[in-house]
């Protein structure tokens, strides 16, 4: 039997970012596995995770751009979601077993608005039990599925926007379509749970769609089917760096120094930022400490593109 040929690589070694509009029912790892097949490379990783039930923005790094993932500032996220008031579940979403059912049709809009307002701003939130948080080296969701009683400590999170867009009264339940803008580490499922608890009727999430993570939005995203039909990156390395990081302009001499891993004089930009040539080519990501702006990642080291 002959050996199977390797899949044809569809991207250059420099790579870039793939912003996927994830379908429901897939894990983040499922998305990575399919993208590896479509693009013909194993050098793909994802920044953060998205629950299987959720749809929307998932950021993947391809080829050399996998090294960008740990440097991206993805601290703010935005979602649209549907919360059902009147029913609590074991997982705080529609995939769990129903714990309680309480009629919620009596709730007035003002009561709901007050409950939403109390969960907006800087709050302490107990993460969802079925979460990827590690307890003693094991994920909370794994312990929960093994039948263990999981208790997680409250954590500070910021919910900068929590707004009800529409309300529907359905068979004693109240379904709320909401938009949430929040810090990384915020669980929208937990917002649904806590809103229902505060209103005395229980609550859980029935739909979740991530519309933005950091600077990347649904406008940047493509579905896996679209990717399969036209295998290409959403953002090449230069585009990805320009969108994701502040930047400074450098001349040809400075570019050559950075390609060799040498440092430049600082210019006062905080955090990690990009060094771009006049034509927008990304050479390196820098961080300033003292009197040096040193590379934390050389995008185009000497020898890679020579």
UniProtKB/Swiss-Prot annotation:
GO biological process, one term: tRNA pseudouridine synthesis
Keywords assigned: Isomerase, tRNA processing
Pfam families from the UniProt entry: TruB_C (PF09142), TruB_C_2 (PF16198), TruB_N (PF01509)
A GO term, aspect molecular function: RNA binding
Catalytic reaction(s) noted: uridine(55) in tRNA = pseudouridine(55) in tRNA
Top class in the EC scheme: isomerase
EC number(s) given by UniProt: 5.4.99.25
Domain of life: Bacteria
SUPFAM superfamilies membership: Pseudouridine synthase, PUA domain-like
Residues annotated as the enzyme's active site: 51
Protein role: Responsible for synthesis of pseudouridine from uracil-55 in the psi GC loop of transfer RNAs.
Family: Belongs to the pseudouridine synthase TruB family. Type 1 subfamily.
Protein name, UniProt field: tRNA pseudouridine synthase B
Species of origin: Nocardia farcinica (strain IFM 10152)
């Amino acid at each position: 039997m002959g050996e199977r040929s390797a899949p044809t690589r569809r991207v250059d070694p420099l790579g870039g970012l793939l912003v996927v509009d994830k379908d429901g029912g897939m894990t983040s790892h499922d998305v990575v596995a399919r993208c590896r097949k479509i693009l013909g490379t194993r050098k793909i990783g994802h920044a953060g995770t998205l629950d299987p039930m959720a749809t929307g923005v998932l950021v993947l790094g391809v080829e050399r751009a996998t090294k960008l993932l740990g440097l991206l500032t993805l601290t703010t996220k935005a979602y649209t979601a549907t919360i059902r008031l009147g029913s609590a579940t074991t997982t705080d979403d529609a995939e769990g077993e129903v714990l309680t059912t309480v009629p919620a049709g009596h709730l007035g809009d003002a009561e709901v608005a007050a409950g939403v307002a109390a969960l907006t701003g800087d709050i302490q939130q107990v993460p969802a039990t079925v979460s990827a948080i590690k307890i003693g080296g094991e994920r909370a969701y794994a312990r929960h599925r093994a039948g263990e009683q999981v208790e997680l400590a409250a954590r500070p999170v910021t919910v900068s926007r929590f707004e009800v867009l529409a309300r529907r009264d359905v068979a004693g339940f109240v379904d709320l379509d909401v938009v949430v803008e929040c810090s990384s580490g915020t669980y929208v499922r937990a917002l649904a749970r806590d809103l229902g608890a505060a209103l005395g009727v229980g609550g859980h999430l029935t739909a979740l769609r991530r519309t933005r993570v950091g600077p990347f939005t649904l406008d940047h995203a493509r579905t896996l089917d679209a990717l399969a039909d036209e295998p290409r990156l959403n953002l090449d390395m230069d585009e990805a760096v320009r969108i994701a990081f502040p930047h400074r302009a450098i001349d040809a001499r400075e570019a050559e120094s950075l390609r060799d891993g040498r440092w430049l004089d600082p210019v006062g930009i905080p955090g990690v930022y990009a060094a771009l040539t006049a034509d927008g080519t990304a050479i390196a990501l820098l961080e300033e400490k003292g009197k040096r702006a040193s590379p934390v990642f050389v995008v185009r080291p000497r020898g890679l593109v020579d």
